[in-house]
UniProtKB/Swiss-Prot annotation:
Catalyzes the acyloin condensation reaction between C atoms 2 and 3 of pyruvate and glyceraldehyde 3-phosphate to yield 1-deoxy-D-xylulose-5-phosphate (DXP). Pathway: Metabolic intermediate biosynthesis; 1-deoxy-D-xylulose 5-phosphate biosynthesis; 1-deoxy-D-xylulose 5-phosphate from D-glyceraldehyde 3-phosphate and pyruvate: step 1/1. Keywords: Isoprene biosynthesis, Magnesium, Metal-binding, Thiamine biosynthesis, Thiamine pyrophosphate, Transferase. NCBIfam families: dxs (TIGR00204), PRK05444.2-2 (NF003933). This is 1-deoxy-D-xylulose-5-phosphate synthase. One of its GO terms (biological process) is thiamine biosynthetic process. Its cofactor is Mg(2+); thiamine diphosphate.
């Protein structure tokens, strides 16, 4: 079949099981080939081919609503809804988004990127449907990893109480990104081996009604029998206790089982949970045999060998540098512990976990719990390192305020993937943390200019005993600078001048320092002497240096790879105002007030104007006409 010619999923309605199985093979081959060039979330999508096809065969999208939790497993859905020709642009600038996108297709009714939101979304859609009096099916698809998120459990509780008609698909592959952890994961394991409870329950009810004379009485006790069966046949029938009709577990790669159970679910009143067992990476051996999450999401790869195609890094990854330095210090300090919300691989904590298994805590998709747990461990004299992506730190904001900062707990927050992250797009860009962290009392916030300063900042953070401290660092690899052998402490709230200058000052930090220096060197050719300051402490700022700069009266440009509203530049404006310096020219560069789409970091920086050319232009505009010796001089 020509998969690129698919316009909508209606063609599935008349296909036989044999034809569907052949289609599945073709879809898998298409994904393996296409993603080998573009990269993407291959493991999750290979695992849901039959499930996605069966859903589109049995339901009528977009009238019936599919809500893909997290959304990285929606590639097959995109293919079946007419976007095959765009797969060559997957996750590229102005190309096909790697997650559901409402502006992309009417079949994408709910946008995702973070986990555990689909059930709340489904409850909202079901409530709206019932108020409007329409009859569409609401079908959230959630993984066993996402089900560990507190928000998902809150929604399960509410849905079961409201008894709204919906069909929850539990896609159970025993992994989210890394192997799942926790009691809910263990409970699902028991369900996988418990047999088909629903079938037995229905058969017994049927038999009761067939018995002469006493059949009616027995049928009347069917509910009590059902309750007994729950405990006799399925240990820990969690979902039934919450008010769901539980179906399964079923083979997520068997069209016979999927279609039979989906048809049964459509006839069942109230909330139904269909427990589907799938194999992540099915059909491609390297992904199918992955046990740690390497093939969850990848860059380009060689199909025949499974080798990843990427240039050899000249420097270690930022995640590896930070976790490695924490591990190094943990050898000397038994108080140091590491906490991650389901990202041990991405945060490069495998080495720490292997060396210190009793001091490593993967709490699952539970950012709020992770933050509060870190605060409590700090209260008991430990030195917690909370490794968390910038985009996921948003989910723990209240706990950072209420439990960590309010109690002035000695927690080191490693804010990974800070700044633009590229291909994962607007749900994953790490651009909000400065704005929502710098206004919290007791918080220290910093970002290094390179990996050498980064290792010293880790040492500074784990040596700091006066409250919470956070270090943001970007995705990807360091610059390859020479590394000091001896770790040292950087005085809190101190900046450094990287390049002297007497005509203007650039205040920046982290990834934007390089473009600032390059812009200053370009302006030097025009006779402008521009100072570049490594403003490595975002909070507290270096007040002594700032007062000196303001006293000089030099124009100031701030640059940050983060949102402007409430960001670092705002803090400089506030400080100047508080010092009564109303006449110093101050300009700010950063992320504009909108969500930044997917694409390469280079393309995105170009689009929003964060380039050395634009930095130079902004400095030129700040200068009094007589100072600028460039064009027209």
């Amino acid at each position: 079949m020509d998969l690129l010619s698919i316009q909508d999923p209606s063609f599935l309605k008349n296909m036989s099981i044999d034809e569907l199985e052949k289609l599945s093979d073709e879809i898998r081959q298409f994904l393996i080939t296409s993603l080998s060039a573009s990269g993407g979330h291959i493991g999750p999508n290979l695992g849901v081919v039959e499930l996605t096809v069966a859903l589109h065969k049995e339901f009528n999208s977009p009238k019936d609503k599919f809500l893909w939790d997290v959304g990285h497993q929606s590639y097959v859905h995109k293919l079946l809804t007419g976007r095959g020709k765009e797969f060559a642009t997957l996750r590229q600038y102005k190309g096909l988004c790697g997650f559901p996108k409402r502006s992309e297709s009417e079949h994408d009714v709910w946008e995702t990127g973070h986990s555990s939101t689909s059930l709340s979304g489904a409850m909202g859609m079901a409530a709206a449907r019932d108020i409007k009096g329409t009859d569409e099916y609401i079908i959230p698809i959630i993984g066993d990893g996402a089900l560990t998120g507190g928000m998902a459990l809150e929604a399960l509780n509410h849905i079961g109480d409201e008894k709204k008609d919906m069909i929850v698909i539990l896609n159970d592959n025993e992994m989210s990104i890394a192997p799942n952890v926790g009691a809910i994961h263990s409970m699902l394991g028991r369900l996988r081996t418990a047999g088909k409870y629903q079938w037995v329950k229905d058969e017994l009810e049927y038999l009761f009604k067939k018995i002469p004379a006493v059949g009616g009485k027995l049928a009347a006790t069917a509910e009590r029998v059902k309750d007994s069966l729950k405990y006799m046949l399925v240990s820990g029938m969690f979902f039934e206790e919450l008010g769901f009709t539980y179906l399964g577990p079923v083979d997520g790669h068997s069209y016979h089982e999927l279609i039979e159970n989906l048809q049964y679910a459509k006839k069942t009143k109230g909330p139904v949970l269909l427990h589907v067992i799938t194999k992540k990476g099915k059909g491609y051996k390297p992904a199918e045999t992955d046990t740690i999450g390497t093939w969850h999401g990848t860059g380009p790869y060689k199909i025949n060998t499974g080798d990843f195609v990427k240039p050899k890094a000249a420097a270690p990854s930022w995640s590896g540098l930070v976790s490695g330095t924490v591990q190094r210090m943990a050898r000397e300090d038994g108080r140091i512990v590491a906490i991650t919300p389901a990202m041990p691989v991405g945060s490069k904590l495998e080495g720490f976990a292997k060396e210190f298994p009793d001091r490593m805590f993967d709490v699952g998709i539970a950012e709020q719990h992770a933050a509060t747990m870190a605060a409590a461990m700090a209260m008991q004299g430990m030195k917690p390192f909370l490794a968390i992506y910038s985009t996921f730190l948003q989910r723990a904001y209240d706990q950072v305020v209420h439990d960590i900062c309010r109690q002035n707990a000695n927690v080191f927050i490693g804010i990974d993937r800070a700044g633009l992250v590229g291909a994962d797009g607007e749900t994953h860009q790490g651009v909000f943390d400065i704005a929502f962290m710098r206004h919290i009392p007791n918080m220290v916030l910093m970002m290094p200019k390179d990996e050498n300063e980064g290792q010293h900042m880790v040492h500074t953070a784990l040596s700091y005993d006066e409250g919470p401290i956070a270090m943001r660092f970007p995705r990807g690899n360091g610059l390859g600078v020479k590394m000091d052998e001896q770790l040292k402490t950087i005085p809190i709230g101190t900046w450094e001048v990287l390049r002297p200058g007497n005509d203007a000052v650039i205040l920046t930090f982290g990834t934007t320092i390089e473009m600032a220096i390059e812009a200053a060197e370009e302006l030097q050719k025009e006779g402008l002497s521009v100072r570049v300051v490594n403003a490595r402490f975002i909070k507290p700022i270096d007040e002594k240096m700032m007062k000196s700069i303001l006293k000089e009266g030099l124009p100031i440009l701030t640059i940050e790879e983060a949102v402007l509203e409430g960001g670092f530049g705002s803090s400089i404006l506030e400080f100047a105002h508080d010092q009564g310096e109303y006449h110093t020219p101050i300009d700010r560069m950063g992320i504009p007030d909108r969500f930044i789409e997917h694409g390469s970091v280079t393309a995105l920086l170009e689009e929003i104007g964060l380039t050395k050319q634009q930095v130079a232009n902004r400095i030129r505009l700040l200068m009094p006409p007589k100072t600028h010796k460039g064009i027209g001089s």
